[in-house]
């Protein structure tokens, strides 16, 4: 059970408001994609507020048959005691793009914590881009996320997350004022073979996040996980050169994942825009390599 994670031991008190996981605080979303003769469709949609999806749209000019889904929240952010669950299922030979409507704000907390579980399943020759907007943890927030991926060896997943240091320009600034941010990602093949696990726990009060070897002088952390067949990963890896440019306030690098699972790309920056641009560059290259399709120009408001 995610709420029993060791890093949450000090945050088991109940909120004075709505109880943990009660109505309005136990969001659920299930997206099931299936192949039709002309395109992939969002065939299954189960939702429980505050997570909302209305329908799939086909706005991607580079891949006109790609269903694009935006996850919306009507809660104004993630609150203490919230328990979110997201399931994404791609049948064989399907393609999908999933994102969020805007940044995910983890609101200030004085009791308990919030969790989100993500379960992603990709069938043979399927392709998923899961590119949410940044996560902004507010002062004293506590958030734990666990992502479980089951992927066929012929499928591809482009998964990203961008973690802000907090509300950088709020008042005098909130840089690393949150209590806890924990994220675990585990991937396995459909036959049950475990590929790798990555977990990072950030507790600013317990250690200097700005030290060398952690964030250093940077304020934004970007993480892109590319699960794809080895031939794709090998070609992409050769095109990614490491960068460390303090004048521009950006640094990135790529490494290979264990068991020929794919690539891991990490980027640090001072602001979210350059970090997201670096992730978009790898996303674009991966899409071109795997599907042969181009990425459309970014929206002006993105």
From Swiss-Prot:
Primary localization: cytoplasm
GO CC term (a single one): cytoplasm
Molecular function, one GO term: nickel cation binding
Cellular compartments annotated: Cytoplasm
Descriptive protein name: Urease accessory protein UreD 2
InterPro entries the record matches: UreD
Keywords, ordered alphabetically: Chaperone, Cytoplasm, Nickel insertion
Assembly: UreD, UreF and UreG form a complex that acts as a GTP-hydrolysis-dependent molecular chaperone, activating the urease apoprotein by helping to assemble the nickel containing metallocenter of UreC. The UreE protein probably delivers the nickel.
Pfam family name, one: UreD
UniProt organism field: Brucella suis biovar 1 (strain 1330)
Assigned protein family: Belongs to the UreD family.
